[in-house]
Swiss-Prot record:
Pathway given in the UniProt record: Lipid metabolism; malonyl-CoA biosynthesis; malonyl-CoA from acetyl-CoA: step 1/1
Comment on bound cofactor: Binds 1 zinc ion per subunit.
Domain CoA carboxyltransferase N-terminal: 21-271
GO CC annotations on file: acetyl-CoA carboxylase complex
Positions of Zn(2+) binding: 25, 28, 43, 46
MF-aspect GO terms: acetyl-CoA carboxylase activity; ATP binding; carboxyl- or carbamoyltransferase activity; zinc ion binding
Protein name: Acetyl-coenzyme A carboxylase carboxyl transferase subunit beta
EC number: 2.1.3.15
Major location (coarse): cytoplasm
Gene name as annotated: accD
UniProt superkingdom: Bacteria
SUPFAM superfamilies for the chain: ClpP/crotonase (SSF52096)
Organism: Lacticaseibacillus paracasei (strain ATCC 334 / BCRC 17002 / CCUG 31169 / CIP 107868 / KCTC 3260 / NRRL B-441) (Lactobacillus paracasei)
Length: 271
């Protein structure tokens, strides 16, 4: 039996369809129309927050902003093969010079120092400029008597910068400690993914630690752990909800609720 032939009208309608009309949620695996994700880019089935750029998140979370240290640019200290090209690709994809945006912002009517790591820039990896901007964020917040809100998203330390990258863990942590010693609030918001050296340092040093639904949060990856202990891990291992049940974080907050939730926390701290 021969297959029916598509008419010219049907072919024209097919050609007129936009590309990437559907998108699959990486967590629940359900398919959705892209339009159904809304401006916040959230899965309508499980509320997983899709990975977004720092500038997109900034538009969702803050009503007034002033960027700090935007002129800092990463060099290539180890002359690592292909690194310059990766930096250029990250800059083109995000509009940032490195993997973090920092500055002063208003969230829910409350002024604070704000940092947003960008998973679209080399998976938000921690390099020298990212570490320097975060360090300056906490130092300026301490001087200005401001609380800090930091959205973490990272695959960990940036291997292309070697020991220069690893040093940022201690440097940022020292600035966080000085900010804490001044009696100021630090709210850490863990998004998908928050892994490696970022989790092992400043991401988990917040006075209040929040997370987005189903975010992957941990140090080593799942496969590495399973191969090390020779056991299969639970399905939701390293997910935000499991960390909440274990007491590692304080709350899981949906992306749409974050401006008001953070605004309330900041208002309570300054009252």
């Amino acid at each position: 039996m021969s297959q029916p032939q598509l008419t010219q009208e049907a072919l024209a309608r097919e050609a007129a369809l936009p590309e990437n009309l559907w998108i699959q949620c990486p967590y629940c695996k359900q398919g959705s129309y892209r339009e159904s994700l809304g401006n916040a880019q959230v899965c309508p089935h499980c509320h997983y927050g899709f990975r977004i750029t720092a500038k997109k998140r900034l538009s969702l979370i803050a009503t007034a902003t002033e960027e700090w240290d935007a002129d800092l640019v990463t060099s290539d200290p180890l002359d690592f093969p292909g690194y310059t090209e990766k930096l250029a690709a990250g800059q083109a994809a995000t509009g940032l010079k490195d993997s973090v945006w920092t500055g002063q912002a208003t969230i829910g009517g409350q002024s604070c120092a704000l940092g947003i790591m960008d998973p679209k820039f080399m998976m938000g990896s921690l390099g020298t400029v990212t570490g320097e901007r975060l360090t300056r964020l906490f130092e300026k917040a301490t001087s200005a008597n401001l609380a800090v809100v930091l959205f973490c998203a990272s695959g960990g330390a940036r291997m292309q910068e070697g020991i220069h990258s690893l040093m940022q863990m201690a440097k940022v942590s020292a600035a966080v400690k000085a900010h804490s010693n001044a009696g100021l609030l630090f709210i850490s918001v863990l998004t998908d993914p928050t892994m490696g050296g970022v989790t092992a340092s400043f991401a988990m040093q917040g006075d209040i630690t929040l997370a987005e639904p189903h975010s992957l949060i941990g140090f080593a990856g799942r496969r590495v752990i399973e191969q090390t202990i020779n056991q299969k891990l639970p399905q939701n291992f390293q997910r935000a909800e499991t960390l909440l049940q274990s007491g590692f974080i304080d709350a899981v907050v949906q992306r749409q609720d974050q401006p008001s939730y953070l605004g309330d926390l900041l208002a309570l701290h300054t009252a």
